[in-house]
């Protein structure tokens, strides 16, 4: 029984050592086999006189492509108005319902105090019953969960 396990482990190590070579050879053999099968099938079909026609695209696809490029190739019959000058206010900035816009307010320079301390108020205050700051006892750190 001992000799069987020794032979089994040496055979397994041989497969493990040559795995990539075996895999490459298997891929090549399968590819060549499938290629030969397809070659024989095509040759047999052509001997029988069967002609394969190349599939043509459907006509509605060509019409769609023509429609897609129609506006680019042909000038549109409707004459568009010229573009406004660049410094002209855009329609997005103001809508026609608004009253005439007032000139922007002018601001004066504010003298800043350089050594002034500012106090910041946090926007989020933790609730008192929040358990993030609770200390964990030392004897539970080593326990596995």
From Swiss-Prot:
Organism in which the protein naturally occurs: Homo sapiens (Human)
- Any idea which GO molecular function terms this record carries? molecular adaptor activity
Name of protein: SLP adapter and CSK-interacting membrane protein
Residues with S-palmitoyl cysteine lipidation? Answer: 40, 42
UniProtKB keywords: Cell membrane, Cell projection, Cytoplasmic vesicle, Lipoprotein, Membrane, Palmitate, Phosphoprotein, Transmembrane, Transmembrane helix
Where's it found, cell-wise? Cell membrane; Cytoplasmic vesicle, Phagosome; Cell projection, Ruffle; Cell projection, Filopodium
Modification(s) after translation:
Phosphorylated by the Src-family protein tyrosine kinases LYN and SRC. Phosphorylation occurs on tyrosine residues upon MHC-II stimulation. Phosphorylation also occurs on tyrosine residues after activation of CLEC7A/DECTIN1 by particulate beta-glucan. Lipopolysaccharide (LPS) induces phosphorylation of Tyr-69, Tyr-107 and Tyr-131 differentially to allow temporal recruitment of effector proteins GRB2, CSK and BLNK. Phosphorylation of Tyr-69 is immediately induced by LPS stimulation and allows GRB2 to bind. Palmitoylated.
Provide the taxonomic classification: Eukaryota, Metazoa, Chordata, Craniata, Vertebrata
Query: What gene is behind this protein?
Result: SCIMP
Enumerate the residue ranges of region (Disordered).
Answer: 74-107
